[in-house]
């Protein structure tokens, strides 16, 4: 699509320049803005303990890793974090990746090839869809959150290996994947189930162990687990968790791991501190749950059309891309930042305001958001 066409269809993307740290309020364009579009779900990106750990990591390791993990970039800090994350999600091994995007591409391409097939939810994150397309395997998309559609697709395949891929929490609507049903279907057809838990880790399940734990499942049902560190954990990077053989396979074959400079060790030190906060400060999840309930109850009373989501992601469906952009602009004029999500990120005709809540927000701030929505709609 040409740039001019994007502009006329209200699909043009812009960057905003922040002038300070993440938080419920942001410094932007010379003024304070109340933001409801961050993925910093637990409010840890600017936590004093995380910041102090990062600075300690800089003092110990410097600011850059200098090389890929397989050369001289893998530090004791990286290794310690991998072990801590493995214990947290209840898996034998974890492998750190620089980003969630590279983790998903690396896993899928390392595990399947031309004689295989990958089955993906139609609304999976772009990194999962790209991973499936680039792997060279037969690529099938099943209907959103529909395990029977997946079952029909698996019935028709004669592929050597079968990989089922889903988000744990879908990033644009906040809905949970039906993991127990997907796991049962995958098991029946001898397929691997891969869950990208970018938006569930830290938020769902006991002690924030994610969407797989939320459903009472484990490695036997979902052998491949991907998590990101830049959302609820408030830092940067990603990881893949699973059995010993999976991790060793990725070390040998995942090109996005082999040929990428390792993240700074200081980030690993900061993430370890953040992980301890996730484990010990359950009040953050409790508060987030209360704020979600407050927002949904208020929205229902106002007649707002929300997606059915129990997560911090609370999209307000608009439909038309231009209308969504105008609503976002009206909110910004009132000092509230909510991003308009438009095609191709979401299907045509389903543009929305992607409202996200965090533990850093207050009840008064959520009430202000509801009041502003009434005024702009």
From Swiss-Prot:
InterPro entries named among the record's database cross-references: Aminotrans_II_pyridoxalP_BS, Aminotransferase_I/II_large, AON_synthase_class-II, AONS_Archaea/Proteobacteria, AONS_Proteobacteria, PyrdxlP-dep_Trfase, PyrdxlP-dep_Trfase_major, PyrdxlP-dep_Trfase_small
Positions with a binding annotation for pyridoxal 5'-phosphate: 100-101, 171, 199, 228
UniProt catalytic activity: 6-carboxyhexanoyl-[ACP] + L-alanine + H(+) = (8S)-8-amino-7-oxononanoate + holo-[ACP] + CO2
Keywords assigned: Biotin biosynthesis, Pyridoxal phosphate, Transferase
Molecular function in Gene Ontology: 8-amino-7-oxononanoate synthase activity; pyridoxal phosphate binding
Pathway: Cofactor biosynthesis; biotin biosynthesis
SUPFAM superfamilies xrefs: PLP-dependent transferases (SSF53383)
Cofactor(s), by name: pyridoxal 5'-phosphate
Binding site for substrate: 13, 125, 345
BP GO terms, sorted: biotin biosynthetic process
PTM sites of type N6-(pyridoxal phosphate)lysine: 231
Enzyme Commission no: 2.3.1.47
Subunit structure: Homodimer.
Matches recorded under HAMAP family: BioF_aminotrans_2
Family listed: Belongs to the class-II pyridoxal-phosphate-dependent aminotransferase family. BioF subfamily.
Function: Catalyzes the decarboxylative condensation of pimeloyl-[acyl-carrier protein] and L-alanine to produce 8-amino-7-oxononanoate (AON), [acyl-carrier protein], and carbon dioxide.
Record-given protein name: 8-amino-7-oxononanoate synthase
Originating organism: Nitrosococcus oceani (strain ATCC 19707 / BCRC 17464 / JCM 30415 / NCIMB 11848 / C-107)
């Amino acid at each position: 699509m040409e740039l001019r066409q994007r502009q006329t269809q209200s699909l043009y993307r812009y960057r905003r320049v922040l002038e300070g740290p993440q938080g419920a309020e942001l410094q932007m364009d010379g003024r304070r803005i109340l933001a409801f579009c961050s993925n910093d779900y637990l409010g840890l990106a600017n936590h004093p303990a995380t910041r102090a750990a990062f600075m300690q990591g800089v003092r110990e390791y410097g600011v850059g890793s200098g090389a890929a993990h397989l050369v001289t970039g893998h530090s004791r800090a990286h290794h310690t974090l991998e072990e801590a994350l493995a214990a947290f999600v209840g898996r034998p091994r974890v492998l750190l990746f620089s980003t969630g995007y590279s983790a998903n591409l690396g896993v899928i391409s390392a595990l399947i090839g031309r004689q295989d097939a990958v089955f993906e939810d139609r609304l999976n994150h772009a990194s999962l869809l790209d991973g499936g397309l680039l792997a060279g395997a037969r690529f099938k998309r099943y209907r959103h959150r529909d395990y029977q559609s997946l079952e029909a697709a698996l019935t028709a395949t004669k592929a050597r290996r079968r990989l089922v891929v889903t988000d744990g929490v879908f990033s644009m609507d906040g809905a949970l994947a039906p993991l127990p049903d997907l796991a049962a279907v995958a098991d029946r057809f001898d397929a691997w189930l891969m869950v990208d838990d970018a938006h569930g880790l830290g938020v769902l399940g006991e002690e924030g162990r994610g969407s797989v734990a939320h459903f009472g499942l484990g490695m036997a049902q979902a052998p491949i687990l991907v998590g990101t560190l830049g959302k609820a954990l408030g830092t940067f990077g990603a990881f893949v968790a699973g059995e010993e053989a999976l991790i060793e396979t990725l070390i040998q074959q995942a090109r996005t791991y082999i040929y990428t400079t390792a993240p700074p060790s200081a980030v690993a030190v900061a993430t370890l501190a953040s992980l301890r906060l996730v484990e010990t400060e359950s009040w953050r999840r409790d508060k987030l749950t209360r704020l979600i309930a407050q927002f949904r109850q208020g929205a229902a009373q106002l007649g707002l059309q929300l997606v059915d989501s129990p997560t911090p992601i609370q999209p307000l469906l608009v439909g038309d891309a231009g209308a969504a952009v105008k609503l976002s602009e009206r909110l910004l004029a009132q000092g509230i930042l909510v991003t308009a999500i438009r095609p191709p990120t979401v299907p045509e005709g389903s543009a929305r305001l992607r409202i996200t809540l965090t533990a850093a927000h207050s009840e008064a701030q959520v009430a202000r958001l509801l009041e502003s929505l009434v005024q702009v709609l």
